[in-house]
């Protein structure tokens, strides 16, 4: 009986950790922002994904042991990440907490970034996780970034960014931003969508 209770408590704790928390787009605009690295694509897609699916909802997680975590993407693919890979992503993604930002949201964004690097490493046969992070920060394009989160079944690629996008990204040749309801993220500030952002992605459940 005692063993059963211990197992039950463990299962409940794991389920609690996976509780999906919805986040309003207005919160995401200001919660965290791009730092010194070239993370605009990652910042944009993580905000859009969290807006649609919530914290703990972008992919499923299963903790295997203290050093291994298995994630299952929306497309059904599974990846196993090491604890040190999450730590490496945390160090590499130089995002900053915005004014009145929620650290929990930013931590989940970094976790999404780690998963993106792992997927990119696999899809592009990149030798090391560290190199995959570098390529994610210095060569990722908004038009294809959804593959790195396994969201190809949850996206519409648009030639023009309409004002009615609930959550997505928009781009120019040099920059990518999170967009929602006619507004865009300008380094942690909510501003009206600039017409210079000519293309985009719409994320959907």
Q: Model-predicted segments: where are they?
A:
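Acidic helix-start/capping segments at beta-turn-to-alpha-helix junctions
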Residues: 62-76
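Flexible propeptides and autoinhibitory/regulatory segments associated with cysteine proteases
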Residues: 16-65, 162-172, 179-205
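Bacterial Sec-dependent N-terminal signal peptides
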Residues: 1-18
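Predominantly the structural core of cysteine protease catalytic domains
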Residues: 33, 38, 77-185, 197-204
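Residues in flexible loops and secondary-structure boundaries
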Residues: 9-12, 48, 79, 89
